[in-house]
């Protein structure tokens, strides 16, 4: 079967934003204009097409990044049909993992900002993730019809807070309730969308006289930015004082793909203005799979290899999301980087070392699905029938194996205990939690050895609340949930040398393991490190991995309160063995004993997670909010003014003090303040806090 759309006409984009910037509405409009949806779904009615889990529709926030395929030929049908895969990503800070996961498989992103709120803390997180994966992006300033909307303020915030290099390619005509349309700086025309056709039609007119000077100034900045793309364009610009439309687009496209600039547009998705222009920019300025470097990976012989985005390359793909669908069972969303695969073919998963048969292949449109026979380089689709694959796994041609770079997922910062309400729930709960943990790598499940309770861990209160809710709805499991617990860590502050000796000789085969370890603090963030410094075979080679294994197991539970020990370095420098009685188990035990004894002498310390908190509050409640943050051991780090007497307070607060904060910030401000928080780093807990935690254990 030949390719329907050439790969150069593919765009794999993510739509990413802070909660409430209007991202889901923007995506809905894209689906409407590209002809997929005939009735626009509104988030207000809980009917948005991309938000397809029940909780999302109730809460009006997006949790799962559903992948959708649509086609666009331009506002004037000026392009050949382009195949656009959209990955909708959540804006709530507890779901940052979803954003991270979709950034890995995108070629480009559209960042949506609210014209009133501008750049929010979550926007900074998403921006950092896009930088980490080198994702080219454009910015869309939404909600231009809202009171307090200011496009140019958001341009400045992108420069200041995100260190971005925004280049507006349109400027707004009016703002707030007088927002009428945009000036297209490339064509130098004013564009007004027709409200009766829900923005399907538009008029291009002369630029209003009062905007002529502004438009000329912004156009000049845009043309200069385009000219910097190459020497050839710069010479043209210097000679002629301007560039042709085609040259401007070429220059902007080159620099956008190189992540040097971010084209900026604006509009109001809710009122059907501006999204159409953004779609044109996606086609003109964002990369196709062949415009970005080939994907890299590790070949079977451990050397580095790569795969070009071409049909004639060997097949390679990355599984980036797992979902349980009520009708077809487990769906694995995957991005094809190279080659072609048909339903029924065998793929190899090098991470699990297993071959699997690819069952049906589905192209997803939010929650509707279309069965297709094959997928090619650049496609994003969902597979049914893969039993082994989990998020971040590579799928490839069994004859030409490559392992693509795996994703790294953050450690959870909060735990709660869950108890099934009945015996029948007990069995179903294990299955349900296993399924949910498979879908979401930032969610962990374990059994507490002492209490026998099931402990679930995640990225925040909302994250766990929604997972428990899904367990109730999708798996019919009723469970009661305990109070949230903080994920403390332990570390050491001093270096010590410690002996560990495990000897058991009571008839028959004995056990003998003996080690000397240097135990010292490691650099923050470095984690666990093991160094083998044995000379002259005093501990035989074959037992050294057992020492490493014993230590790895031991650091999962520290001596203060049983929390994992982080940032610690072990050097095995001496020891002894017995010809007959020594074995791996004995050395594992000896290492574990040395760690337990040594840690007690190495000034063990409790670490607690600190959160970056931002509170937006009307000025009159500022005192209450600041006082409350201080009473929670918060350190205020700065303040900013926003439109309409709103103040933004930034602080660092220990997570243990933030439980139930949403209720208390509402009562402090009569429901008018909002806040967001995300994990920042671990820091030493004050003595009184550490003692309280240790005594509780």
UniProtKB/Swiss-Prot annotation:
Residues 8-290 form the tr-type G domain. The keyword Membrane does not apply. InterPro entries: EFG_II, EFG_III, EFG_III/V, EFG_IV, EFG_V, EFG_V-like, EFTu-like_2, G_TR_CS. It holds the Pfam family GTP_EFTU. GO terms for cellular component: cytoplasm. SUPFAM superfamilies: EF-G C-terminal domain-like, P-loop containing nucleoside triphosphate hydrolases, Ribosomal protein S5 domain 2-like, Translation proteins. It is found in: Cytoplasm. GO terms for molecular function: GTP binding; GTPase activity; guanosine tetraphosphate binding; translation elongation factor activity. One of its GO terms (biological process) is ribosome disassembly. GTP binds at residues 17-24, 88-92, 142-145. It comes from the Bacteria. Keywords: Cytoplasm, Elongation factor, GTP-binding, Nucleotide-binding, Protein biosynthesis. Gene3D superfamilies: 3.30.230.10, 3.30.70.240, Elongation Factor G (Translational Gtpase), domain 3, P-loop containing nucleotide triphosphate hydrolases, Translation factors. The keyword Magnesium does not apply. Catalyzes the GTP-dependent ribosomal translocation step during translation elongation. During this step, the ribosome changes from the pre-translocational (PRE) to the post-translocational (POST) state as the newly formed A-site-bound peptidyl-tRNA and P-site-bound deacylated tRNA move to the P and E sites, respectively. Catalyzes the coordinated movement of the two tRNA molecules, the mRNA and conformational changes in the ribosome. Belongs to the TRAFAC class translation factor GTPase superfamily. Classic translation factor GTPase family. EF-G/EF-2 subfamily. PANTHER family: RIBOSOME-RELEASING FACTOR 2, MITOCHONDRIAL (PTHR43261:SF1), TRANSLATION ELONGATION FACTOR G-RELATED (PTHR43261). HAMAP family: EF_G_EF_2_B (MF_00054_B). This is Elongation factor G. It comes from Dechloromonas aromatica (strain RCB).
